[in-house]
Amino acid sequence: MNKRIYLCLAHMSGKEQMYIKEAFDTNWVVPLGPNVNGFEKDLEEFVGEDKHVVALSAGTAAVHLALLACGVKPGDEVLVQSFTFCASSHPITYLGATPVFVDSEVDTWNMDPALLEEAIKDRIEKTGKTPKAIVPVALYGMPYKVDEIMAVADRYGIPVIEDAAEGFGSRYDGRMLGTFGKYGVLSFNGNKMITTSGGGALICPDGEAKREIMFYATCSTSIFRQSFQSL
């Protein structure tokens, strides 16, 4: 069989050029503006659960800023799924922390809850420290074992950053992926369920968390912190 099966092909609705022209015509060629704000609101309505969403430059940036907001620092360890794209783990190293890879289970090909708990116990025994975060992935859009992973995370008080970059629109028990953990990562790269050519977003638990992420995403400038107080 020689036919290539693509992960996902970009679908154009016909309105993309209109919105690009609108951005140029109104001189909103900087990173933020009405279209970005409207996109964030649409995403918040779509994912539900009273979540707040920040549009970012990439899904990788969303992982990076979520780790930063969870307090990951040099010398820390973060548990991450082993079967995933490298962007799930690279941001851990950006912060000087160490990724600890957890293997998959056979049902979903995602993080194995039993191996996750073994890894937590192992790292506590060997380092005397609890890992700072857990990054399960919705590989190919397949939900990971949410209930079991969250139960393990709760037992050890470790925040979960859901990498739902490939799982936008997927639901578990009627609820959108990316809304179960403390943060949820989305990607709009060209091979994802919807695309902005590049780009991503971070699902945040509340408005305060959203403002913190936006502060980091805008070079930590005080003018943006003041501008976003009303969000």
Give the positions of each predicted feature.
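Phosphate-binding glycine-rich loop
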Residues: 32-77, 91-93, 101-103, 126, ...
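Structured binding elements
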Residues: 96
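Structural motif of enzymes handling amino- and sulfur-group chemistry
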Residues: 17-24, 208-216, 224-231
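Solvent-exposed, non-membrane alpha-helical residues enriched in polar/charged side chains
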Residues: 21, 25, 40-44, 64, ...
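Active-site phosphate-binding strand-loop segment of PLP-dependent enzymes
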Residues: 107-196, 201-209
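Conserved coil-to-alpha-helix start sites within the AMP-binding
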Residues: 84-89
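Hydrophobic residues in well-ordered beta-strands that form the structural core
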Residues: 74, 80, 101, 160-162, ...
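N-terminal "arm"/small-domain region of PLP-dependent enzymes with the aminotransferase-like
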Residues: 1-30
